[in-house]
């Protein structure tokens, strides 16, 4: 059968989509570039916040409305797990597959290969029984091998998911309710996948998880992430980039910092979601409230790696956030001088403890605070980027284009920029995608750098 996969949401979803892609291809099914060509369309759904669920339902309805006779539509992943009845209720969805069932995609497609009988309104869709995650008991990580995964990349960067699920129970977050507790991928499986990616031409491996710094706890590892990184650096070439995303601060140990500083492969970059900086707000979030400790960690990271780029995300307008608490967040940003920051407007998620908190902040106030925070951070990011003007930085080229005057221009990223969420480096001239070149920075904006390649 011909299949087409649509991926919504985060990089962790992209990894699962690649896993389904690999499993299907090993059974002789053929990937096609568009939904119109496919016999089976698979939508890997997102359930992060209400806006993501609305987008998921919109995509499902649009694809269902364009289905031709005999074409099948599968809703897989997070929203299929968290809101199964809502997803299955979309007329035209033929089957659902939860977050811990995606390795059974071939079994489900096999069910759908039977002669087509049009579904009548209200008729149950096909499904693989969902794994129960409400009991909080971790199950083993989905056992998929690198040989099953076909990694076809438009860029020389690949995500590698080292665990799934999360042991934290932040008051605003629904993820554990449909992902379950953390399940770490064994070290050997991570190493094998990394080697497979490098052999396929990948130059940058981005490690992702719901909670990266908790990696290996369920495997009995102490400082599991540091252990994994040291072993990864033994099996990857020195010029490979290894980037860390979603590293919660209370899991950042002295050993991890030392490991990051010791190997050339590990990017001096850390994505460290903080969510807020006022102790009272953090307590309501059910997160560690020690902001002073966070500042000490930032100082230790910069002492070990003076050029490190630190990224974080914050939530504005969390229930009960007073003017004083918001101003404390702004003061923290002034003190921390983070290189990259993203901010979410608080989204009230049904079923979370935060949704029941008193003193919900008015949408107009949330919007005003979001803009104020982002204006402040833009000035900080601009100042941080200006420090690179006149310096040389290695750039991973990802594509080519032309400037307004028609001059050739190459587009890439430095170690300071994660794929899709951070800035870019624009280099005069035409250089092949996948190459790493030294660039002298000549200009900087708040988000991007410009420069000349050095011969």
Swiss-Prot record:
Q: Which PANTHER family match?
A: RIBOSOMAL PROTEIN S12 METHYLTHIOTRANSFERASE RIMO, RIBOSOMAL PROTEIN US12 METHYLTHIOTRANSFERASE RIMO
Cofactor(s) the protein needs? [4Fe-4S] cluster
* Keyword Cytoplasm set for record: yes
Protein name as catalogued: Ribosomal protein uS12 methylthiotransferase RimO
Per UniProt, the keywords (alphabetical) are:
4Fe-4S, Cytoplasm, Iron, Iron-sulfur, Metal-binding, S-adenosyl-L-methionine, Transferase
Task: Tell me the name of the encoding gene.
Answer: rimO
Ranges for domain Radical SAM core come to: 152-383
Where [4Fe-4S] cluster 1 binds, per the record, is at: 10, 46, 78
Enzyme Commission number(s) of this protein: 2.8.4.4
Q: Which SMART domains match?
A: Elp3
**Which Pfam family is an annotated match for this chain, by its short name?**
Radical_SAM
All residue ranges annotated as the TRAM domain in the record: 386-455
GO biological process: what's one of them?
Answer: tRNA modification
């Amino acid at each position: 059968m011909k299949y087409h996969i649509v991926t919504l949401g985060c990089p962790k979803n992209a990894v699962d989509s690649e896993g389904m892609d690999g499993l299907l291809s090993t059974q002789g099914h053929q990937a096609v570039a568009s939904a119109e060509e496919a016999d089976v369309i698979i939508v890997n759904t997102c359930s992060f916040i209400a806006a993501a669920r609305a987008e998921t339902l919109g995509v499902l309805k649009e694809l269902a409305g364009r289905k031709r006779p005999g074409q099948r539509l599968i809703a897989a992943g997070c929203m299929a797990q968290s809101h199964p009845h809502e997803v299955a209720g979309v007329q035209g969805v033929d089957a659902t597959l939860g977050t811990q069932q995606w390795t059974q995609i071939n079994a489900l497609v096999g069910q759908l290969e039977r002669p087509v009988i049009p579904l009548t309104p209200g008729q149950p869709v096909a499904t693989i029984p969902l794994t129960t995650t409400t009991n909080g008991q971790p199950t083993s990580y989905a056992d998929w091998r690198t040989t099953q995964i076909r990694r076809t990349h438009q860029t020389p960067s690949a995500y590698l998911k080292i665990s799934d699920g999360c042991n934290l129970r932040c008051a605003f977050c629904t993820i554990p309710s449909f992902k379950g507790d953390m399940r770490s991928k064994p070290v050997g499986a991570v190493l094998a996948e990394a080697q497979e990616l490098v052999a396929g031409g990948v130059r940058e491996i981005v490690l992702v998880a719901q909670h990266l710094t908790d990696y290996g706890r369920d495997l009995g590892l102490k400082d599991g992430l540091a252990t994994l990184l040291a072993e990864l650096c033994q099996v990857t070439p020195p010029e490979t980039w290894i980037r860390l995303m979603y590293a919660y601060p209370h899991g950042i140990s002295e050993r991890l910092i030392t490991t990051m500083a010791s190997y050339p492969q590990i990017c001096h970059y850390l994505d460290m979601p903080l969510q807020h900086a006022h102790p009272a707000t953090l307590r309501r979030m059910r997160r560690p409230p020690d902001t002073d400790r966070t500042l000490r960690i930032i100082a230790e990271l910069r002492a070990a790696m003076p050029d490190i780029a630190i990224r974080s995300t914050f939530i504005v307008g969390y229930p009960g956030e007073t003017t004083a608490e918001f101003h404390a967040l702004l003061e923290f940003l002034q003190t921390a001088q983070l290189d990259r920051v993203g901010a979410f407007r608080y989204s009230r998620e049904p079923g979370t403890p935060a949704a029941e908190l008193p003193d919900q902040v008015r949408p107009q106030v949330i919007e005003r605070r979001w803009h104020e925070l982002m204006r402040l951070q833009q000035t900080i990011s601009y100042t941080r980027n200006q420090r690179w003007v006149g310096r040389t930085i290695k750039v991973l080229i990802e594509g080519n284009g032309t400037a307004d005057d028609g001059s050739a221009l190459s587009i890439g990223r430095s170690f300071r920029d994660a794929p899709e969420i951070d800035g870019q480096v624009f280099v005069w001239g035409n250089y092949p995608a996948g190459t790493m070149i030294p660039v002298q920075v000549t200009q900087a904006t708040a988000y991007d750098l410009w420069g000349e390649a050095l011969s």
